[in-house]
Design a protein with these regions (language model features):
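Short, well-ordered beta-strand micro-motif
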Residues: 20, 40-42, 182
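Metallo-beta-lactamase
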Residues: 25-116
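A generic structural signal for well-ordered coil/turn residues at beta-strand boundaries
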Residues: 15, 35-37, 177
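Active-site HxH/HxHxD metal-binding segment of metal-dependent hydrolases
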Residues: 1-22
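C-terminal regulatory/interaction regions
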Residues: 121-189
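Structural motif
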Residues: 22, 44, 175-177
Length: 189
């Protein structure tokens, strides 16, 4: 907490646990992926706030779902899919009844895999990241004249490209000091 701008009044533990706050017991579930220190919180009335671990049904058409690290996000969604709570509250819109939650987890995974496969299909030959980004933005009609917004799109595309490299769908090479990405031949099943 030495590097923080403000001193926190309560430090939330960095592991899965029960945590008392103002005399009330909450469950803490570590779910990195969307961000490195992302957590879910379970209230005493058995409601789980999943925050950005998942997209709600209302957001299943997201063009470029954000995750800092897609492999960690998949693991966190699987972990949450094994939990059983009466309801789940999802950031940016949505409450999911507990009985429907496992299907929502599967649908979130399917959306990310679908987007990754679509992005992979846009790389047929060794291609620079800038060109991949341009193709993805054109494909999803993410057209803007605002640099800050285009940087957000670029960030989201980069995390998908990193996922494709990490999982062996794309390989990197260098040419004249520029990193190029090419398909390895591995396909989504």
């Amino acid at each position: 907490s030495v590097c923080l701008v403000h001193t926190p009044d309560v430090i939330i533990p960095s592991e899965d646990c029960n945590f008392e706050f103002c005399g009330v017991n909450f469950g803490i579930i570590q779910t990195p992926g969307h961000s490195s220190g992302h957590i879910c919180v379970v209230t005493p009335d058995d409601v789980c706030y999943v925050a950005d671990t998942l997209l709600s049904r209302e957001n299943q058409d997201a063009k470029l779902p954000y995750a800092l690290h897609h492999v960690a996000a998949f693991a966190s969604r699987r972990k949450m899919g094994e939990t059983r709570h009466s309801h789940y509250i999802i950031a940016h819109k949505g409450i999911c009844p507990g009985a429907d939650f496992p299907a929502l987890v599967r649908d979130n995974d399917a959306l990310i895999l679908r987007r990754a496969e679509e992005i992979l299909s846009m790389v047929q030959e060794p291609t620079s990241f800038s060109e991949i980004n341009r193709r993805v933005c054109a494909h999803y009609k993410l057209l803007t004249r605002q640099p800050r917004r285009s940087l957000r799109f670029e960030r989201n595309v980069r995390f998908f490209v990193e996922y494709l490299v990490d999982e062996g769908y794309l390989e990197m090479s260098c040419e004249d000091g520029a990193t190029l990405y090419a398909p390895t031949g591995k396909h989504f099943t």
